[in-house]
């Protein structure tokens, strides 16, 4: 068994979350974590987390597309000052805030979390009601989770709304490194 499975943004998850075997994929992923595996998922891999672990995170819902793969893809491109809410991450960074950059439209946004979910990073961010035709009405998402983690059985899941690609800065990279080594 693998120790960690990474589901990066852009993973082709349509078959896994909408196909005939979607419930089987979700059950297998959940069992993997319950038996001690870890999952790291980012941005567009959110539907996999939502299907396998629905009780830990609530997702923003788009007023235009309220279900399906576009439903929680509401974040606008922006750089924001985010609060590091986890004491361990805050101590490792030596600071209480970091700059988080989103360089693309329609990033996946969380709305809230269950009590058992650990929130590492929070911020207020701008969103838009995206459709297949582009952005629509703008809105503000106040104090939303950007990075979370939760235990399931013997394993752990970490989800982050931001990428670790071209728009990453040193603070974002350090947070992600700390979280991956925690898995």
What are these regions (language model features)?
Residues 52, 169-172:
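A short, polar/proline- and glycine-enriched secondary-structure boundary/capping micro-motif
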Residues 56-71:
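Acidic, Ser/Thr-rich peripheral helices and adjacent loops at domain boundaries
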Residues 71-170:
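Catalytic beta-strand/loop cores that center a nucleophilic Ser/Cys/Thr
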Residues 33, 72-76, 183:
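Cysteine-dependent hydrolase recognition
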């Amino acid at each position: 068994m693998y120790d960690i499975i990474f589901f990066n943004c852009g993973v082709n998850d349509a078959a896994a979350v909408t196909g005939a075997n979607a419930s089987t994929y979700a059950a297998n992923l959940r069992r993997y974590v319950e038996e001690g595996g870890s999952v790291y998922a980012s941005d567009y891999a959110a539907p996999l987390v939502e299907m396998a672990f629905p009780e830990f995170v609530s997702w923003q819902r788009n007023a235009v597309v309220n279900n399906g793969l576009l439903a929680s893809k509401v974040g606008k491109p922006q750089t924001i000052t985010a609060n590091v809410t986890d004491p361990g991450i805050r101590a490792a960074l030596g600071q209480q805030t970091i700059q988080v950059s989103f360089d693309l439209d329609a990033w996946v946004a969380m709305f809230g979390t269950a009590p058992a979910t650990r929130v590492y990073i929070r911020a207020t961010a701008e969103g838009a009601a995206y459709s297949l035709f582009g952005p629509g009405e703008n809105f503000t998402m106040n104090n939303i989770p950007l990075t979370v983690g939760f235990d399931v059985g013997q394993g752990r899941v970490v989800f982050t709304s931001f990428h670790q690609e071209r728009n990453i800065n040193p603070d974002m990279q350090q947070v992600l490194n700390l979280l991956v080594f925690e898995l």
